[in-house]
Structure formats: C-alpha cells, structure tokens
Amino acid sequence: MTTPHRFSTGIPALDELLGGGLVPGTLTVVMGATGIGKSQLGLQFANAGQQQEGERGILFDMASRGDGQNHGDYAKRMFEWLLKQRQIDEPCAPDDIWNRERMRSDYFHIFERSGRRVSIRDLEPDQWAEWRVELNRKLDQSIAFFYGNFVHGVRRCVIDGVEPTDRASDSFQFHVFDYIYHQILHKDADWVARDLFRIHFRANEEAVMSHLYDHQQLATMLLYTSHEVLLDELLCRPIESGDELANANTIILMGKVRDGLKMRRALHVAKHRGSACSDEIIPFEITEQGLTLLEG
C-alpha cells in the first residue's frame, strides 16, 4: 500500500480533531501521568498501520526499571495481536536483514532487566562511562530492529517507557531517543544501512538499494510520562530548551479533570503544526478496545 497523506491514530474521533490525522515524517508526543492511557493510544496508532499501510507499527520500549508497559496484554486484549518480541541479545547476521520471517518483529525492550535509574545525576562518572559502552551495544541492536522492520514495509513506530526527570537533559533515555530519532528515524535509508552493516555494507549494497524507504514517510509517536496528573497542570507546564516537546510537530496532553465530585480523563491537542486542529478539551474513557472519546 502507498503511504497515506495522513496517518490515522486508530481513533476516528481523534483523527477528526487533528484535521485528518498525523503528518508523515513528523514526531508526535503524547504526554500524561502513569496509567492515563498513553500505551493504549500508542497501540491503537500502531495497529492502524495494518489497514492503512498494510503493516502494523512497531513498539520500542525504553522502560528501565521493573517490567515493560504491558504492551503484550493490551495488544492481545484490544486487537488479538500477539506481539513478536525481538530479544536484546538476539544475534543478527547481515543476511538476516533481508529475511522477513527473521526480522519482522513488533516489540523491542532496550533496557530489559537493566534496573537503571533514568537520571545521569544518579551515576558516578565512571558508572556513566561504563553505561555508555553498554548503550552503544544496545543501540546497534536498536538499529537492526528499526531498519529490519522498515525495509519490510513498516512505516510507523511508537516509543514508550520514557520516565519523568526534573530536566530532560539529565535523562539518559532522552540521550537514547535523540540518537534514535536523528540517526535512525530521520536519516536516509542507505546511511542507516551503513551504520548497521559497517564493513559488510559493500557486500549488501545491492540489497540495500533495492529496499530503500523514504524516512520522510515515517511517523513517530513518543509516549512521555509526566509528573503532572491533572490536565490543567500539563497545560501550564513550561517547555525547557532541548525538551522533546519543543521539537514535536504534534503534542497531545492526557490528564485528569474534575467533574463535580469525581475525576475523569480528558485530552487536549496542544500543538499540531501545519494543520487545523480543535482547541477543545475532550473527555475520554478506556475500554477493552482502548481509548474512546466522549461528548463533552
């Protein structure tokens, strides 16, 4: 299938708020506290790729403490989708990349079993140096995960598990995201292949050129956990220099709002560059099928 003019979020009512959906080649940040429904929204977006582009999106989990984000349980319950996980230590020979059965996977947990805190301030200089060596190895695996899916038709990705810190610049998760976004997701396919294959690039050059994809036709959704629980607090949150919110084309805020004597969930499209979008605060609920937007 051809890449659409807009990527559906998997929620028709939200697509309508966004003037038709998300813009290809851009970053969407979905921000809200733990448990508000970000992972479900991310899965709905990823699943929508099956109908729209012919391939579901992929999930890149950056949670560094405890288990992942329960993507497998959610995907099975919401869509009867059994996620195929790529393991962090799974070997990958150059010839494997072109084998769809070998490379096409749905989920990758980069910091699985690491148990690390997300702030660089928590690490001594020698610990940070040691951790960067380990990160480099994990990033090599990450290149294989993304490239190995993109050459087989995937056009959307969801990055989840980003934990809150006082300053985004102190978070090693944001260092990793910055690398992935600029050196994998927004880089010409043949140059990503060079980073992956290195000395084996020439031997694979013909296959690389026959599997080119346009990185401007990829859509990325970053699910960003906030300290703030209330939607009003998120609306007032300052954006610091280097914050991924400043670089995003689209920002969707999800939080709690007071409705009389009870709290309910609501979302707001705070930014949607280059497109008309609604200014409304829209209540929603989470069902077995995911997010459902409600009448105000």
Name each model-derived stretch.
Residues S8-L22:
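Pre-Walker A adenine-sensing motif
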